[in-house]
Amino acid sequence: GVCNNTSSIKVARSALHYFEEPSISGSNGSGTIFFSGCNLKCCYCQNKEISTNNFGINISIKRLSELMLDLQSKKANNINLVTPTHFVPSIIEAIKLARRNGLNIPIVYNTSGYESVDTIKLLDGYVDIYLTDFKYFDNKLGEDLSKVKNYFEVASTALDEMYKQVSKNKFSNNGLMTKGIIVRCLVLPTKGNDTKKIINYLYQKYQDNIYLSIMNQYTPVTTNNSFLFLNSKVSEEEYDDIINYALDLGVKNAYIQEGDTSDESFIPPFDLEGL
């Protein structure tokens, strides 16, 4: 299918990850499982090795549950399922099995945001934290850059369902999120106005009942001859302008990035670690 996979679970890495939002990674790290394949075709993808090239190995539901328990034994703050959409039925079975065997840390669903409501409804009761992208306000950008139609409508409807499930943000005593929603807005070079429209939409609808994560870490990993603006990083001025816009709106619950995070060293090696 579109995601380059069958229903058989395929993963590329299972390890502690320290570069998520502070309330997700904390000091112990997030127990991150990277799934192979993706339902988007972003031409600027930083994880192309696993999303497009489909690197990884097939594992059973039982093995996936064991990976979750192994990460918990390494003191992971949570189980972070990255690009999980196309394996949801199997993931739910693995969560059930892992919980029967002692899994008791939060489940993070780390998604592109391009989800069907039916899929999100399946996850009710299994996911504690939705860590979701909101990539585009302008659907033409979604078509051009990610090869999907109606990104805004699909993502906003899916987010509504996520909000119904986990609308009350909860944190542990040491500041780790245990339930809630973080919406990631990746700023693309020269497309700051699109990001502003997303922030405005989200704040008008949800106020500070969700957390925003406004990201400047876009990294041009290959030369793009079709969309030349993707060949540069986001300037400090562009990013500061968006942060000031969010502050002027009244946004209080948001993560921002300081300094230069647009570096390939922030991209994990996909080397089958932990499998």
What are these regions (language model features)?
Residues 72-97, 144, 150, 160, ...:
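Conserved glycine-rich "GG(E/T)P / GGGxP" loop and the immediately following alpha-helix
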Residues 51, 88, 113-116, 134-152, ...:
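Conserved radical SAM core fold
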Residues 3-129, 138-139:
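Conserved Radical SAM active-site core
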Residues 31, 79, 107-109, 130-132, ...:
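Hydrophobic faces of well-ordered beta-strands that scaffold small-molecule active sites
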Residues 167-275:
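Auxiliary Fe-S-binding modules of radical SAM enzymes
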Residues 124-139, 209-218:
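Non-cysteine beta-strand/loop elements that form the S-adenosyl-L-methionine
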Residues 143-174:
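Anionic-ligand binding region
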Residues 64-67, 91-95, 119, 123, ...:
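A general structural detector for well-ordered alpha-helical segments in enzyme core domains, enriched
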